[in-house]
Amino acid sequence: LISKGRAELVVGRGSAVEAFPLFGFDLKDYDALFAEKLDLLLKVRDEEFVTWSGKFRPAMNNQPVYPRALQKKLPVWLGVGGTPASFVRAGTLGLPLMVAVIGGQTASFRPLVDLYREAGRRAGFSPDQLKVGLHSPGYVAETNEQAIADYYPGYAELWTKLGRERGWPPVTQSKFNALIAPEGVLVVGSPEHVAEKLARHSEALGGVDRFTFQMDNAGLSHQQLLRSIELIGEKLIPLIKKNA
């Protein structure tokens, strides 16, 4: 309602296992919890009066859920990482797919995206119903050099800290350079550079309908983020449309 119908949801199982004990859940129920909660979410989205029962929360009997979304059908994307079953689930349900890629090369996800499309086809959904999105850390500045200078320090600090907690090696300049290379997943650079990289990502995955940036994970200032958003709207999007 606040966004006047522009809001959409991306839902996924999540990678932060620390939340489970906070809510009194057992990590062994990781997948079952998500399957049940996704089922309830779609039920609430599609029906004003909900009758539903499950294992992990009280049942609902003809209960109304308000406020309703402004859209006739609130878009719900299924966010996935690298688990094949998650791609199959999205295809079987006919939900649009949002692939979260934070490391490696985008092309390595092509077999999983193909798995999604095949599962959707087998479930009776048409190709235009099976949308694919790509979510990745990214940042746009006036030049490649400026983007890297702005982005690298905060990115390295954050991911090195997370890595210490999870047993990952620290971020180095050479590893960062590999991630911003033509085949790497990070989308950091000038509008022209980013437009070219997004085109390569789309080709690598057999076509991408949407790309979402995660820009607030590198200690960027409010002004830097605002300018990046301006560049995306004023320069990057026109370039993408021109080359489409």
Residue ranges and their predicted role:
Residues L1-A244:
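Active-site-adjacent structural elements that line small-molecule/cofactor binding pockets in enzymes
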